[in-house]
Amino acid sequence: MWRGGRLGSRGVRLLETLGFGCPSAVAQPPRLTSRSAYSGTQLTRNLQIKPWELGEHGTMCFRSYRMALSCLSRVKTYRTPWKRLYSTSQTTVDSREVKNFQALAHTWWDEYGKFAPLHSMNDLRVPFIRDNLLKTSASHHPGKPLSGMKILDVGCGGGLLTEPLGRLGASVVGIDPVAENIKIAQHHKSFDPVLDKRIQYKVCSLEEAVDESAECFDAVVASEVVEHVSHLEMFIQCCYQVLKPGGSLFITTVNKTQLSYALGIVFAEQIAGIVPKGTHTWEKFVSPEKLESILEPNGLSVETVAGLVYNPFSGYWHWSENTSLNYAAHAVRSRAQEHQEPAESALKGETGALHANTSGSPSVREEQRT
């Protein structure tokens, strides 16, 4: 590399002093070092050299070197607030979950593939949704019992549940943050002209749908979704906002128990391969009690909770009184006048009590007579 030639012995010594290598040294394998680590070790050591030890030309190099380092540190400080602003923005979408489902998007409609349990679950969850909606509906249409109803399918995936609801007559909007899932769903519904008119798919999150669909839906379906979201309470609040007063929320999910960890993750994912590895995170599982404690304060009254059990040998689901594994929940949004803010209710209570006390006093009664 560098020899005595043009640089001269003085220039070579200067380069060696600044840490750019020694021509006579044996070449060492490169070391991967981050920029911050390098700045804290090599550059700091070099900057400890006294300017008068370098001579006139060395002092100029030293000053230029220090100025460049100062500029780099300023750039870093300007970037920090933007990074912090981005990282603190809240969303119900977990980016790690998105990556998992991106890799599985092409297998949605394989009835014997990775999503076989979801195909089989339709035998229970579709009637569960239909029957509970009919309890609140005044009109019934033979053959199309959900005709006239508008349903939001959150986390619709490839449309496994969206299409059966559309066949029952409902107008269904399926949303999913994974673009690959929506492409698969769009392609599959195109084979049925009737479904093509009744079903609409969008690549978006639930909180994005709130902006344009407040109080628009008769029902919101979140089947096998809440165990994949971040900020569960924010997710429930968004469900409330897009529902019409008196609308229904349907949730199927996994309970947070030792049994659900043993069977839902260890057996189903790691041993039997019924579910792809990494599909579930036990810390995100939610118990019926925990779910109800979030639903009720947010204006959603729980009507039904029922256990679901999957038989991996037959490939079928059945209802159960045991909710320690999977369960389905149906909640109804309260009417506008029924769901008052706590502060408003307390204020009305205090006003009523004050009125009762004042009207009961002798002086007030005397004034009322006159």
Swiss-Prot record:
Subunit structure of this entry? Answer: Component of a multi-subunit COQ enzyme complex, composed of at least COQ3, COQ4, COQ5, COQ6, COQ7 and COQ9.
- What is the official name of this protein in its record? Ubiquinone biosynthesis O-methyltransferase, mitochondrial
Sequence positions bearing N6-acetyllysine: K144, K150, K197
At the top of the EC hierarchy, this enzyme's class is: transferase
Protein EC: 2.1.1.64, 2.1.1.-, 2.1.1.114
Q: Does the keyword S-adenosyl-L-methionine apply?
A: yes
Functionally, this protein is described as follows:
O-methyltransferase required for two non-consecutive steps during ubiquinone biosynthesis. Catalyzes the 2 O-methylation of 3,4-dihydroxy-5-(all-trans-decaprenyl)benzoic acid into 4-hydroxy-3-methoxy-5-(all-trans-decaprenyl)benzoic acid. Also catalyzes the last step of ubiquinone biosynthesis by mediating methylation of 3-demethylubiquinone into ubiquinone. Also able to mediate the methylation of 3-demethylubiquinol-10 into ubiquinol-10.
Q: Does the keyword Lipid metabolism apply?
A: no
Organism in which the protein naturally occurs: Mus musculus (Mouse)
The cofactor(s) it depends on are: Mg(2+)
Q: Where is the transit peptide?
A: 1-86
Where do the annotations place Mg(2+) binding? Answer: E224, E227, H228
The principal location of this protein is: mitochondrion
Point out the gene that encodes the protein: Coq3
